[in-house]
UniProtKB/Swiss-Prot annotation:
It comes from Ureaplasma parvum serovar 3 (strain ATCC 700970). Its main location: cytoplasm. Gene3D superfamilies: 1.10.10.200, 3.30.70.980. SUPFAM superfamilies: YebC-like. This is Probable transcriptional regulatory protein UU295. One of its GO terms (cellular component) is cytosol. GO terms for molecular function: DNA binding. One of its GO terms (biological process) is regulation of DNA-templated transcription.
Length: 236
C-alpha cells in the first residue's frame, strides 16, 4: 500500500499541474480580450480561448474576471510562434505569450537543443498542419453512424473512432454550430477545441520518444509557452 506522503505528493503534483494549465488559459483569455475586445462573438480568438479554458475546467467566474480585467492589465504580452524539427523529421510548433521575447526564445532554443532538434524558418512547418475544430465525444450515447446521420448536413471534415471515443473534425468556422448540435443531442463531450491537426503522423524509436517527452514537459512547465504540438503518432 502506498504511503500517505507519497499519495499526498502525487495529489499536490496534479494540483500544481492543473493550476499551471489554468494560469495559461487565463493568460490567453486576457491577451485575446485585450487585443480584440471583450465580446467573444466579435473576437474569434477570445472565443477559442474561452472554449479551451472551459475544456480545462476553468470556472466561468474566472473567465469573466480575466476578460473584464484585460483592459486594466499593464503587461504588454506578445504572441510568438516558433516552428522547428526534431528527430526523424518530427514537426514541432510552439506558441508562446510573453512580455520578454529574448527570455522566451532563449528558453525555446535550449529545449530544441536538448531534443537534438532545430528551429526552422516561419511557415516551413505549419504547412504540415491544418487548423480544425476537434470534438471528442463518448461512444456510449450514440454510435458513429448515428452521429454521422445527425451531422450529415454539416461541413464535416472527418469522423473517426476508437473503442471509447468518436473524433469529429470540422472547419473552424463551423465549430460552434457543430458543438451546439452535439449538445442538443445529449453528446457526452470529452474535449472541444480548435487546434492544429497534422496532415500525417510519424513514429519515433524509444530514445527519441524519451527526448520528446522531456521537450514537451519542459514546454508545459514554461509559463511563457501556451502550447506545443507535434506530428508524433502517439499522444504524450
Amino acid at each position: 500500500m502506498p504511503r500517505k506522503h507519497l499519495i499526498a505528493s502525487g495529489i499536490n503534483k496534479k494540483q500544481q499541474q492543473q493550476a499551471k494549465i489554468w494560469m495559461k488559459c487565463a493568460k490567453e483569455i486576457k491577451a485575446a480580450a485585450k487585443m480584440g475586445g471583450p465580446n467573444p462573438e466579435a473576437n474569434s480568438r477570445l472565443k477559442v480561448a474561452i472554449e479551451r479554458a472551459l475544456n480545462n475546467n476553468l470556472s466561468r467566474d474566472s473567465i469573466e474576471r480575466n476578460i473584464n480585467g484585460a483592459s486594466k492589465d499593464i503587461d504588454n504580452l506578445k504572441e510568438l510562434t516558433y516552428e522547428g524539427y526534431g528527430p526523424n523529421g518530427l514537426a514541432i510548433i510552439v506558441r508562446a505569450l510573453t512580455d520578454n521575447e529574448q527570455r522566451t526564445i532563449s528558453a525555446i532554443r535550449g529545449y530544441f537543443s536538448k531534443l537534438q532538434g532545430q528551429i526552422a524558418k516561419p511557415n516551413s512547418v505549419s504547412m504540415l498542419f491544418n487548423e480544425c475544430g476537434q470534438l471528442l465525444i463518448n461512444k456510449e450515447t450514440k454510435s458513429l453512424d448515428e452521429w454521422f446521420e445527425i451531422l450529415i448536413d454539416q461541413s464535416i471534415i472527418d469522423i473517426n473512432e476508437d473503442d471509447k471515443i468518436i473524433e469529429i473534425l470540422v472547419k473552424p468556422e463551423d465549430f460552434s454550430t457543430v458543438k451546439l448540435i452535439l449538445e442538443k443531442n445529449n453528446a457526452d463531450i470529452k474535449s472541444a477545441e480548435i487546434k492544429l491537426i497534422p496532415n500525417d503522423f510519424i513514429s519515433l524509436d524509444e530514445y527519441a520518444r524519451e527526448r520528446l517527452v522531456r521537450f514537451v514537459n519542459a514546454c508545459e512547465n514554461d509559463d511563457d509557452i501556451s502550447w506545443v504540438i507535434t506530428n508524433y503518432e502517439e499522444e504524450l
